[in-house]
Amino acid sequence: MITSRQLRAARALAGLDQRALAKASRLSLPTIQRMEASDGVVRGNVESLMKLIAALDRIGIELINEEAASTSGGRGVRLKGPAGPRAKRA
């Protein structure tokens, strides 16, 4: 599951506005706006959520759930490591 705070943070980390994220995920701008305005866990149909998560993955954003190993715990987002799509190849 992804929270609205994670979604906003992921979008900011990727340097995208809502319109660009909507285009990248093939969702409507109002859908992205509703998802970001959700309280807590993002609400939406499964297909829309899968499109959103896939788009973030392609962009190079990793979603971190609350069960992930971490010294401080909690949900979050981060840029993917060198194996991600933005990696420079020699």
What annotation goes with each model-predicted range?
Residues 7-20, 81, 87:
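Short basic helix-loop element that most often maps to the first helix and adjoining turn
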Residues 10, 24, 35:
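Residues in the recognition helix of alpha-helical DNA-binding motifs
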Residues 24, 45, 69:
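Residue-level "edge-of-site" marker
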Residues 57-90:
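Short, charged recognition helix plus adjacent turn
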Residues 1-2:
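A detector for short, charged/polar N-terminal pre-domain segments
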Residues 26, 46-63:
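DNA major-groove recognition helix of helix-turn-helix/homeodomain DNA-binding modules
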Residues 27-44:
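Recognition helix of helix-turn-helix/homeodomain-like DNA-binding domains
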